[in-house]
Structures are given as structure tokens and as C-alpha cells.
UniProtKB/Swiss-Prot annotation:
InterPro entries reported in the protein's UniProt record: Ig_E-set (IPR014756), IRK_C (IPR041647), K_chnl_inward-rec_Kir (IPR016449), K_chnl_inward-rec_Kir_cyto (IPR013518), Kir_TM (IPR040445)
Gene of this entry: Kcnj14
The name this protein goes by in its record: ATP-sensitive inward rectifier potassium channel 14
UniProt topological domain (Extracellular) ranges: 109-131, 149-157
A Pfam family of this chain: IRK_C
Length: 434
């Protein structure tokens, strides 16, 4: 797509009559607002995800020179990264090859000494080893320390003794490698990501009088994620003023790195907030522009597993169609007696906030600057009251559901439980002027 645009631009530049059109096309491609790709490129077809919703990267490597040699140079990491079935097959073949190699060695030593001849010598190198199968069984018993007591090595042949010593050393090294690789693979925090979840959608709404992009993260386990922190990047195609086409330009999305709010205490689900300011790549996007935009928001959660102290990383992504403008997340944290309760039924649910501005954050800032000398606040008080009452109603509905479940489960209630538990309602995030 970018190559075709570059060829069209180049052909237009070579034709004298189309020089002005080529300049206009180049200016439109390179100097479009906020660096977005032109409308025909972004509007014809949505590009595939770079990072899937489950965190897997949608990338395939091709034409790698010397790929096998590079993987074998770091054999331990290769064994840890491969699937279990290939790992088990590799280790089984390694043990089998070791037994066959030393069995063949013992058979050759016995054959050269004459132990396999029709009249066996009075002092053989190996007792009860008269064939290749017997030599293979002797190698197996030696490396695994089975010790049936039938076959053994004698002091007649120093070469046989040296071969037995060499097999013991090689067997110890192979066992250590196999045990280390299996333990490292079992201790990988990859499966820990299954209990770290992101919300299905992200939302764009006002918070503290600023337009913010928000999404939720949650931990389904009781064990904590130590030193948990979040990051986000915006991936989008871009054409530089020089005409270079970048298929995926990575832009950092600030989630509070300077203030330290990117480091989270993930005991209950937390809403990650990105304030859309002048440094944000979404600063010039309103609701209409967002629907036509072509980008991918990649969100990352990192931390150390409490049980193993190994670092884990959980990833997900959001497309423009998954950013809900003018929505907020439903409350998930409620107080039940002396404990707090997290209801994951509401984790992915959102509700619409009427009156949310549909313009971009840039236009909001311009309007706020124009109305800065006005004594009245431009933010309606009825909207703030609705937001608070809406979240309060959600908490009350949660209380009613709990009360109905309690009444159905028990015929009589104690006086302590007669009073309905008080829900932990979110505090009003918007302070209205008097």
C-alpha cells in the first residue's frame, strides 16, 4: 500500500504537468493532521492486529539466514521455548542416542578384545556381554544406575573402565541439563498471564475536567503481582515529510510515568488513565475522527510473580472500534461487612454518560481558554449529578441482588444481617464551583 503510493508520487514528480498535483499529494500524505495516514489508505481496509487480544504477537519471521545454527548456539533457551511435545521428544532421543553410543562403544571394545569369539577368553572386558543388545543393556544399566548385578566391567581392559567413567560423567551432565530445562519451563510465568485480564473495551470520558482514555486491568489470583506497572503504545502508519512510509510508528502513551501512577497495587481491578493532553497522540481526535482512525493501542502489564520472583508480561490491544466514547466502567468494588468484595460480573461492563463532549481534547482546551474569564463553569452540574447518581444506582442494584440471594438461601436472618451492607460507592470525581 505504501509502495504503491510512493510509486504514484514518483511518477507524478517525473511528469511536468503533474508536478503540482504530486506536491499536493505529498503534502497531504506527509503533513496530514497528527501524522495520520491519508483517508484512502486508512478508510479502505482495516489492518490486522499487531498484538492479538490474548497477547500473542501477530508476527511471522521469514527468510532468516542460518536460523538453525542460531537456535542451536543457545540450546538451553531453545529447549525452554519449544512446546512440551518437542521437548519430550528431544530429551527422549538424547537419552536413547547416549545409550546407543556407549553401547556401541562397549560392543567394539569387547569385539576387539575377542570377547565375542566362539571360545570366549578366560578374562573378558565385560562379564555377560556377548552381543550388541547385551552391550546396549549394559550401557542403559550403567547410566541409569539400575544395577541388576548380572553385567559388569572387569579390570582386564583399561579402555572399558575409561568408557564406563566417561559414560557416568556424560550421564550426569545430560541429567542436569534435562532437569534444569524442565524446571525452567515449568517455572515460566507464561501461564500466570491467564489470570491477568484487561477489559474488553477502553473508554473515553471526562475525569477531573479532562478528557481521558481509560481501560481496566485485573488480577484473578489471590497472590499479588510485585512491582506491577503498566505501559501503552500507539501503533499507526505514518508518512514523514520526506516521503518515508513507516508501516507501524510506535508512540508512547503516557499513563503517569513521571508521576509514578504507572506503578499500581493490583489487589482489586484498577482503571488505568491516560490524560489526553497536548502531548497525547489522541489530542486532535474527536468522536468522529476516532471512528475513522487507523491505529492500534497496545497495553502492557508487567510485574514479578510473588511465588517465583520471575518477571511476567501480559499484553492486549484495542482498535478504534473498541474505544467507547462517552462511557465509564461500572463499579466492581463493594464493601460487605468488614471485607471488600470484587464482583467481576461488572469488570467489562460500561455505561454511557450523556453530555460527554464529542469534540477533541484540543478543541476543549481552546474553548476553555476562551471561557477562562467567564465566572460560570462550562461544565453542567446536572451531568455531574447524573454520573454520581448512576454509579450510586449501580451499587444499590448490587446490594439488592445480594439481599435477594440471602433471602432465598436462608429462611430467617439474624438481627446483624437485617441491615443491608453498605456499598462502597465511588466518590464524585468532579468538583463543582459554588
Amino acid at each position: 500500500m505504501g509502495l504503491a503510493r510512493a510509486l504514484r508520487r514518483l511518477s507524478g514528480a517525473l511528469e511536468p504537468g503533474n508536478s503540482r498535483a504530486g506536491d499536493e499529494e505529498e503534502a497531504g500524505a506527509g503533513l496530514c493532521r497528527n501524522g495520520w495516514a491519508p483517508g484512502p489508505v486508512a478508510g479502505n481496509r482495516r489492518r490486522g492486529r499487531f498484538v492479538k487480544k490474548d497477547g500473542h504477537c501477530n508476527v511471522r519471521f521469514v527468510n532468516l539466514g542460518g536460523q538453525g545454527a542460531r537456535y542451536l548456539s543457545d540450546l538451553f533457551t531453545t529447549c525452554v521455548d519449544v512446546r512440551w511435545r518437542w521437548m519430550c521428544l528431544l530429551f527422549s532421543c538424547s537419552f536413547l542416542a547416549s545409550w546407543l553410543l556407549f553401547g556401541l562403544t562397549f560392543w567394539l571394545i569387547a569385539s576387539l578384545h575377542g570377547d565375542l569369539a566362539a571360545p570366549p577368553p578366560p578374562a573378558p572386558c565385560f562379564s555377560q556381554v556377548a552381543s550388541f543388545l547385551a552391550a546396549f543393556l549394559f550401557a542403559l544399566e550403567t547410566q541409569t544406575s539400575i544395577g541388576y548385578g548380572v553385567r559388569s566391567v572387569t579390570e582386564e581392559c583399561p579402555a572399558a573402565v575409561a568408557a564406563v567413567v566417561l559414560q557416568c560423567i556424560a550421564g550426569c551432565v545430560l541429567d542436569a541439563f534435562v532437569v534444569g530445562a524442565v524446571m525452567a519451563k515449568m517455572a515460566k510465568p507464561k501461564k500466570r498471564n491467564e489470570t491477568l485480564v484487561f477489559s474488553e473495551n477502553a473508554v473515553v470520558a471526562l475525569r477531573d475536567r479532562r478528557l481521558c482514555l481509560m481501560w481496566r486491568v485485573g488480577n484473578l489470583r489471590r497472590s499479588h503481582l510485585v512491582e506491577a506497572h503498566v505501559r501503552a503504545q500507539l501503533l499507526q502508519p505514518r508518512v514523514t515529510p520526506e516521503g518515508e512510509y513507516i508501516p507501524l510508528d510506535h508512540q508512547d502513551v503516557d499513563v503517569g510515568f513521571d508521576g509514578g501512577t504507572d506503578r499500581i497495587f493490583l489487589v482489586s481491578p484498577i482503571t488505568i488513565v491516560h490524560e489526553i493532553d497536548s502531548a497525547s497522540p489522541l489530542y486532535e481526535l474527536g468522536r468522529a475522527e476516532l471512528a475513522r482512525a487507523d491505529f492500534e493501542l497496545v497495553v502492557i502489564l508487567e510485574g514479578m510473580v510473588e511465588a517465583t520472583a520471575m518477571t511476567t508480561q501480559c499484553r492486549s490491544s484495542y482498535l478504534p472500534g473498541e474505544l467507547l466514547w462517552g462511557h465509564r466502567f461500572e463499579p466492581v468494588l463493594f464493601q460487605r461487612g468488614s471485607q471488600y468484595e470484587v464482583d467481576y460480573r461488572h469488570f467489562h461492563r460500561t455505561y454511557e454518560v450523556p453530555g460527554t463532549p464529542v469534540c477533541s481534547a484540543k478543541e476543549l482546551d481552546e474553548r476553555a481558554e476562551q471561557a477562562s474569564h467567564s465566572p460560570k463553569s462550562s461544565f453542567p452540574g446536572s451531568l455531574a449529578a447524573f454520573c454520581y447518581e448512576n454509579e450510586l444506582a449501580l451499587s444499590c442494584c448490587q446490594e439488592e441482588d445480594e439481599e435477594e440471594d440471602t433471602k432465598e438461601g436462608t429462611s430467617a436472618e439474624t438481627p446483624d444481617r437485617a441491615a443491608s451492607p453498605q456499598a462502597l460507592t465511588p466518590t464524585l470525581a468532579l468538583t463543582l464551583p459554588p
